[in-house]
């Protein structure tokens, strides 16, 4: 997911994710045991899909620092558009290619469901991930909608 900063919008408090909250990425674990470990720097993504899920959760938690930290330096923007009116609802991973522990690159196709101004929508994207200095990072994406 690659939402870049756009025009200024009214701000709202970030959605509250407690350590015991279900992880936004959709895996059957608490936020603290799943993507929260990556967001806090206590673990690193071992696959491209794990990084994709953690980045989706970072969008849901409005964790701009994590999003920028996991973005390839060649394509990283100065800031990320974290629209306060948008609420991420759920993530569907549609397919993956490579992106495993022994790969140097991989792709993840996914659909991210959201609500904005009381209307539901979905973003379908095919994201590319590469290893940079040994860690998985987001490179770029092709919107599929």
Language model features with spans:
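Short beta-strand edge/turn micro-motifs at domain boundaries
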Residues: 124-145
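Core segments of small alpha/beta cavity-forming domains
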Residues: 38-84
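Short Cys/His-rich zinc-binding micro-motifs
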Residues: 13-29
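Cysteine-centered loop/knuckle micro-motif
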Residues: 33-35
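Contiguous, function-dense segments enriched for cysteine-driven chemistry
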Residues: 13-16, 45, 82-85, 102
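Short functional micro-motifs and their immediate structural scaffolds
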Residues: 28-30, 39-40
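Surface-exposed, charged secondary-structure patches
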Residues: 84-122
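Intrinsically disordered, low-complexity linkers and tails
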Residues: 1-17, 100, 109, 128
């Amino acid at each position: 997911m690659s939402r870049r900063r756009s025009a200024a919008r009214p701000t709202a408090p970030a959605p509250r994710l407690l350590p015991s909250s279900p992880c936004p990425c959709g895996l059957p674990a608490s936020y603290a045991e799943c993507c929260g470990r990556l967001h806090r720097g206590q673990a690193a993504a071992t696959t491209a899909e794990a990084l994709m899920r953690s980045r989706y959760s970072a969008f849901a938690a409005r964790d701009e620092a994590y999003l920028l930290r996991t973005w390839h330096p060649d394509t990283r923007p100065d800031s990320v558009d974290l629209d306060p009116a948008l609420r991420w609802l759920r993530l569907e991973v549609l397919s993956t290619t490579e992106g495993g522990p022994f790969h140097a690159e991989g792709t993840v196709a996914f659909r991210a469901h959201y609500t904005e101004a009381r209307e539901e929508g979905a973003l379908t994207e095919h994201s590319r991930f590469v290893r940079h200095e040994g860690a998985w990072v987001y490179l770029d994406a092709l919107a599929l909608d």
